[in-house]
Each structure stands twice: as structure tokens, then as C-alpha cells.
Amino acid sequence: MLQTLFLTMLTLALVKSQYTEETITYTQCTDGYEWDPIRQQCKDIDECDIVPDACKGGMKCVNHYGGYLCLPKTAQIIVNNEHPQQETPAAEASSGATTGTVAARSMATSGVVPGGGFMASATAVAGPEVQTGRNNFVIRRNPADPQRIPSNPSHRIQCAAGYEQSEHNVCQDIDECTSGTHNCRTDQVCINLRGSFTCQCLPGYQKRGEQCVDIDECTVPPYCHQRCVNTPGSFYCQCSPGFQLAANNYTCVDINECDASNQCAQQCYNILGSFICQCNQGYELSSDRLNCEDIDECRTSSYLCQYQCVNEPGKFSCMCPQGYEVVRSRTCQDINECETTNECREDEMCWNYHGGFRCYPRNPCQDHYVLTSENRCVCPVSNTMCRELPQSIVYKYMSIRSDRSVPSDIFQIQATMIYANTINTFRIKSGNENGEFYLRQTSPVSAMLVLVKSLSGPREYIVDLEMLTVSSIGTFRTSSVLRLTIIVGPFSF
């Protein structure tokens, strides 16, 4: 009886103990994780950082939750945040990793907190949580928290800081960023983490203490090709005058001002970062270095033209006075009107001089004289009126330029007939009242008229040059006159 009562009470005690609430705290983690006493949760171990030469054969080490991967250095890693089907809380732990596969470690029956991570050998290329392509590796992150409830769902659990119990009695992460329980500043961005959160600065800012300060990108060259302008949270590039930003907003390229907005009045030449203007012949750049001004060549020199310089836009021209024409662009040459057009009558002859022409009678003979040949008049011996007159008068004409240099030989007189036993003498009979001329005998039968004073025209001089012929025995005496008309032109050319 007593034995039966004891067994009954023991059974009730055991049944009652099954419904007693317990508080279970886990401080052990699965392989690949370690306990964080501050955050009160398991955190991943970075094997790539602590394991010397974790990967061999030129492979690179890639840390992963609960383990690491050895992948080719050229591999591209793509993180896939897709949530796979979560394991049941009572899953049994598998054995260690094998070469060529990835071994997943799950919760053990002893109550050790699983990490959901994995480890891979140097030749690992596939596994339950890794998908690979030819050179791409897609890693599936296990979103399950590194804590799970015991296999008995009737037990209460105590979650670490940053976690809360879900309706399924699972410790799930608290998203402080969406719940508004974070303490990030208004100029910061809240980033949720497993069991916690972090505050990050906006792009272009960096943390200094608890504050976000602007990053001066311009102090870290070479962001910009030429000029860098820092702005709050960013920067932009500027180019020097004559350059413009390229499509990459970094490089400065030269602006061809001659093609874009040609400001030159005449000729434009592009140079690196600028341009220069040039003018056509006959023009010069004005003070603004853009426009062209005409050069007044006539003011720069008085020797450009023989007579008169006329300035024109971009050039100049030379003019000559009436009776002259321009030759070789600058000099003046007399027009021989007697060979072209003149107004002389039929009984007149045309005589051209420098700058004009004159008409003289074809028969210039005076009274008592008879025209015997062209321009030669003879007074007959039979005429008693001729005894006191020169036997003959020859008419000659010449033209000289104004302001001719002196002394200068200008005309030679010579006897046309030579008599035996005679002596010839020469003199200026008339037309030299001011002493402009001098007659120098050069031989017994010739003399030279010399200009000794400069003459200015236009002017006409008529000079009678007389030759006296005397017989050496005194039986013969005669004279003849050369009437020379000298026309002085109006100019020195």
C-alpha cells in the first residue's frame, strides 16, 4: 500500500516538473562562430584573417558565415540574399567537411548553438549553400539567426541583445532602423545588422567621432584634370578658360574657338587653351586683339609713291599728275600726247615735254627768212635787209625736268659747215638775262650749253645760241643762230 502511494506521488512530481517554466541561456557557439559577451550573441570568425595560408595553390580566401571558401583569384563572387527553406530546429549535426564539397554545420542535440556556416577545402566548388558557374560563385547566405530554441517547444528562451522572441519561439533580429529604435543622426543612414545596427555617413562624408564631416575630394588628387571645386558631400571639376569638360566630367579638352564662336574679324588660329587673331595684309590688330584696323601706308612713309599716295582699305595706290601715268605701281612716266592724241593744227607740229605738250608752227621763219628745210630758215644774200641779220636760224626744242641738279650739260651746238681759214666762236646772244646758262666751247666747231642754276617749272625759256665765223685773212664774216626753246616740266620726274 505504502509502496503504491510512493510511486503515485513520484509520478505526479515528474509530470508537474514537465510544465515548470525554465530560462535557458546559451553561451556556446558552433564551429566557425565565437560568443560575443558584449552583444550577447554568436559572431562569425574571419578564418581568412586568423588562419595562416588558409588557401593554397594561388587561390584566394573568401570569408563566409561559419567558414570560408578558397576560390580562383579571377572568380567573381555574387551574393544571393534569397532566403532558402530554414532547417528544422531539431536537425542533427553532420560530420566534418570532405574534399570537393562544402560541409554545413547545424545544431547538435547537446544544445550547442549552431552557426549555420560552412567550411570548404581548397578545391571546393559546390555544396548545399554554394552555387558556382564557370567563373562566378553565387553564395547563399543563411538568414537564420545563430540561435535556436531547444527541441522542446514548451521551454521559454532568453534572446541576446538585439534579438526578440518570435511567435514561433525563435530568436529573430530586431530591425532598429525600421522600428525607429536607433540613435543615428539626421545626416546619417541607419544600416541594420544581425542583432544590432550601425550608422553610416552619406556619400561624400566620413565619420569623425560621432559626426559626419565632408570629404574634401579636392585634397586627394588627381580627381580633376585641371580645377577641382569641393561641395558639401561631393565635388565637381572645372576647366581653365579655353577648355571644356569632356563627357567623363573629369578631363579638360581644348575648345576650338575658331570653329565654335569665331570672334576674329579676319583670320583665326586656334592654339591650346586659347586662340589668336591675325589680319590680312594691309591691316593690323586693334587694341582689343580681335578686330582689324586699316594701315595707312601713306602716313608710314613718304617714299612709297613718286607723286601722291592714296590710302585704301587694306592697301594703297599711287597717283600721278595730269600728263603722267603710273608705271610699276609707284612711279610716274610722262605721257607722250604727240603719239596719242593732241590738239595741234595741221600747220603745227606737236612737241612733247615732261607733263604735257605744245604746238609750234611748222614754218617758224621770221620776215626776210625763207624755210629751206625743217626748222631751218635762211636769209638770202640777195636781200639787202639780210646784211645785218644772221645768215640762218635753226629752231630746236628740248624739255628738262624741274629742279634738275646743277651744273648740268644740257645741249650741244655744232657747226654744220666748215670753211677753210676761218675761226668759230660761240656765245649766248639772248635769253640768259638771269644767268641760268653758260656756253662752254668744246672744240673749234662745237660748244656745250650748261645749266648752272636750277629751274622750276612749268616754264619756257628761249635761248639764242650764236656761232660767229670769221675769216683768218679778214675777208669773210658771218653768223648763224640756233634758237633753242627749253620747256621746264612742272615736276622733277
From Swiss-Prot:
Q: Which residues form the EGF-like domain?
A: 26-71, 173-213, 214-253, 254-293, 294-333, 334-378
Give the region (Mediates interaction with TIMP3) as residue ranges.
259-493
- InterPro entries in the record, alphabetically? cEGF (IPR026823), ECM_structural_protein (IPR050751), EGF-like_Ca-bd_dom (IPR001881), EGF-like_dom (IPR000742), EGF-type_Asp/Asn_hydroxyl_site (IPR000152), EGF_Ca-bd_CS (IPR018097), Fibulin_C (IPR055088), Growth_fac_rcpt_cys_sf (IPR009030)
Q: Which PROSITE patterns match?
A: ASX_HYDROXYL (PS00010), EGF_2 (PS01186), EGF_3 (PS50026), EGF_CA (PS01187)
Q: Where does this one sit in the cell?
A: Secreted, Extracellular space, Extracellular matrix
SUPFAM superfamilies in UniProt: Growth factor receptor domain
Q: Which GO terms describe its cellular component?
A: collagen-containing extracellular matrix; extracellular matrix; extracellular space
Protein origin, superkingdom: Eukaryota
Q: Which GO terms describe its molecular function?
A: calcium ion binding; epidermal growth factor receptor activity; epidermal growth factor receptor binding; growth factor activity
Q: Principal localization?
A: secreted
Query: Got any disulfides in this one, which pairs?
Result: 177-190, 184-199, 201-212, 218-228, 224-237, 239-252, 258-268, 264-277, 279-292, 298-309, 305-318, 320-332, 338-350, 344-359, 365-377
Keywords carried by this UniProt record: Calcium, Disulfide bond, EGF-like domain, Extracellular matrix, Glycoprotein, Growth factor, Repeat, Secreted, Signal
| Glycosylation site list | 249
Q: Phenotype when inactivated?
A: Mice are viable and have no overt phenotype at birth. However, they exhibit reduced reproductivity and an early onset of aging-associated phenotypes including reduced lifespan, decreased body mass, lordokyphosis, reduced hair growth and generalized fat, muscle and organ atrophy. They also display multiple hernias associated with a reduction of elastic fibers in facia, the thin layer of connective tissue maintaining and protecting structures throughout the body. However, there is no apparent macular degeneration.
List, in alphabetical order, the GO biological process terms annotated in this UniProt record. camera-type eye development; embryonic eye morphogenesis; epidermal growth factor receptor signaling pathway; negative regulation of chondrocyte differentiation; peptidyl-tyrosine phosphorylation; post-embryonic eye morphogenesis; regulation of DNA-templated transcription
Pfam families listed in its UniProt record: cEGF, EGF_CA, Fibulin_C
In the record, the note on similarity to other proteins reads: Belongs to the fibulin family.
* UniProt cross-references to PANTHER family, sorted A to Z: EGF-CONTAINING FIBULIN-LIKE EXTRACELLULAR MATRIX PROTEIN 1, EGF-LIKE DOMAIN-CONTAINING PROTEIN
Q: What is this protein called?
A: EGF-containing fibulin-like extracellular matrix protein 1
| Organism, scientific name | Mus musculus (Mouse)
Upper lineage: Eukaryota, Metazoa, Chordata, Craniata, Vertebrata
- The protein's gene is named Efemp1
